[in-house]
Amino acid sequence: MSSKELRYAIAVMVGVMLDAVFFWKFQPYSAREHGHDLLPWYCLPVLAFVAGLLLSIGIEGKKRWVPLAILGGFFGANACLIVADCATDPTNHNLWPFEFVMIAAASSPAFLGAAVSGLLKQRKV
Protein backbone atom coordinates (compact mmCIF):
# COMPACT_ATOMS: atom_id res chain seq x y z
CA MET A 1 0.00 0.00 0.00
CA SER A 2 1.43 3.33 -1.00
CA SER A 3 1.57 6.36 1.26
CA LYS A 4 -1.24 8.01 -0.68
CA GLU A 5 -3.50 4.95 -0.37
CA LEU A 6 -2.77 4.76 3.35
CA ARG A 7 -3.78 8.40 3.77
CA TYR A 8 -7.03 7.73 1.91
CA ALA A 9 -7.76 4.75 4.16
CA ILE A 10 -7.05 6.85 7.25
CA ALA A 11 -9.32 9.58 5.85
CA VAL A 12 -12.18 7.07 5.49
CA MET A 13 -11.60 5.94 9.08
CA VAL A 14 -11.63 9.57 10.24
CA GLY A 15 -15.03 10.01 8.55
CA VAL A 16 -16.37 6.90 10.28
CA MET A 17 -15.09 8.11 13.65
CA LEU A 18 -16.64 11.55 13.13
CA ASP A 19 -19.99 9.87 12.49
CA ALA A 20 -19.62 7.69 15.58
CA VAL A 21 -18.79 10.64 17.82
CA PHE A 22 -21.20 13.25 16.47
CA PHE A 23 -24.20 11.22 15.23
CA TRP A 24 -24.20 7.78 16.84
CA LYS A 25 -22.81 8.97 20.18
CA PHE A 26 -22.72 5.30 21.27
CA GLN A 27 -26.38 5.54 22.32
CA PRO A 28 -29.69 4.10 21.09
CA TYR A 29 -31.73 6.23 18.69
CA SER A 30 -34.24 7.40 21.29
CA ALA A 31 -31.52 8.71 23.62
CA ARG A 32 -29.28 10.48 21.08
CA GLU A 33 -31.15 13.76 20.89
CA HIS A 34 -31.68 14.10 24.62
CA GLY A 35 -28.39 12.72 25.89
CA HIS A 36 -25.17 14.61 26.39
CA ASP A 37 -22.79 15.13 23.50
CA LEU A 38 -19.35 13.56 23.51
CA LEU A 39 -18.00 16.72 21.87
CA PRO A 40 -19.77 20.01 21.13
CA TRP A 41 -21.00 20.46 17.55
CA TYR A 42 -18.55 23.25 16.75
CA CYS A 43 -15.71 20.73 17.05
CA LEU A 44 -16.87 18.83 13.94
CA PRO A 45 -15.83 21.47 11.36
CA VAL A 46 -12.60 22.10 13.26
CA LEU A 47 -11.72 18.40 13.32
CA ALA A 48 -12.65 18.06 9.64
CA PHE A 49 -10.39 21.00 8.75
CA VAL A 50 -7.47 19.60 10.75
CA ALA A 51 -7.92 16.12 9.25
CA GLY A 52 -8.09 17.51 5.71
CA LEU A 53 -4.99 19.60 6.32
CA LEU A 54 -2.84 16.96 7.99
CA LEU A 55 -3.77 14.08 5.71
CA SER A 56 -3.21 16.03 2.50
CA ILE A 57 0.18 17.52 3.39
CA GLY A 58 2.81 15.92 1.22
CA ILE A 59 0.44 14.35 -1.31
CA GLU A 60 1.44 15.00 -4.89
CA GLY A 61 -1.29 15.81 -7.38
CA LYS A 62 -4.91 16.40 -6.56
CA LYS A 63 -5.52 16.82 -2.86
CA ARG A 64 -9.31 16.76 -3.10
CA TRP A 65 -9.41 12.97 -2.73
CA VAL A 66 -8.56 13.19 0.99
CA PRO A 67 -11.62 15.28 1.93
CA LEU A 68 -13.75 13.19 -0.42
CA ALA A 69 -12.56 10.07 1.43
CA ILE A 70 -13.46 11.71 4.76
CA LEU A 71 -16.90 12.58 3.39
CA GLY A 72 -17.32 9.07 1.95
CA GLY A 73 -16.49 7.45 5.28
CA PHE A 74 -18.90 9.79 7.04
CA PHE A 75 -21.68 9.07 4.52
CA GLY A 76 -21.09 5.31 4.61
CA ALA A 77 -21.12 5.13 8.40
CA ASN A 78 -24.27 7.25 8.60
CA ALA A 79 -26.01 5.09 5.98
CA CYS A 80 -25.21 1.99 8.06
CA LEU A 81 -26.50 3.77 11.16
CA ILE A 82 -29.76 4.66 9.41
CA VAL A 83 -30.27 1.07 8.22
CA ALA A 84 -29.59 -0.30 11.70
CA ASP A 85 -31.92 2.21 13.36
CA CYS A 86 -34.73 1.66 10.85
CA ALA A 87 -34.52 -2.11 11.28
CA THR A 88 -35.96 -1.75 14.77
CA ASP A 89 -38.38 1.10 14.02
CA PRO A 90 -39.11 2.15 10.41
CA THR A 91 -40.18 5.63 11.54
CA ASN A 92 -36.66 6.53 12.69
CA HIS A 93 -34.73 8.90 10.43
CA ASN A 94 -37.77 10.29 8.59
CA LEU A 95 -35.64 13.20 7.38
CA TRP A 96 -32.56 11.18 6.45
CA PRO A 97 -31.67 13.21 3.32
CA PHE A 98 -31.17 16.26 5.51
CA GLU A 99 -28.73 14.30 7.65
CA PHE A 100 -26.51 13.88 4.60
CA VAL A 101 -26.82 17.59 3.77
CA MET A 102 -25.80 18.45 7.35
CA ILE A 103 -22.86 16.04 7.13
CA ALA A 104 -21.70 17.57 3.85
CA ALA A 105 -21.96 21.10 5.25
CA ALA A 106 -20.28 20.29 8.56
CA SER A 107 -17.40 18.37 7.00
CA SER A 108 -16.81 20.81 4.13
CA PRO A 109 -13.92 22.48 6.01
CA ALA A 110 -11.91 19.34 5.15
CA PHE A 111 -11.77 20.71 1.59
CA LEU A 112 -10.49 24.01 2.95
CA GLY A 113 -7.83 22.13 4.92
CA ALA A 114 -6.70 20.33 1.77
CA ALA A 115 -6.56 23.65 -0.09
CA VAL A 116 -4.49 25.22 2.69
CA SER A 117 -2.03 22.32 2.48
CA GLY A 118 -1.67 23.05 -1.23
CA LEU A 119 -1.00 26.72 -0.48
CA LEU A 120 1.58 25.75 2.12
CA LYS A 121 3.35 23.57 -0.42
CA GLN A 122 3.39 26.38 -2.99
CA ARG A 123 4.81 28.75 -0.42
CA LYS A 124 7.67 26.39 0.44
CA VAL A 125 8.70 26.08 -3.21
Question: What kind of feature is each model-predicted range?
Answer:
Residues 91-125:
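Alpha-helical membrane-associated segments of multi-pass integral membrane proteins
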Residues 63-76:
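Central hydrophobic cores of alpha-helical transmembrane segments
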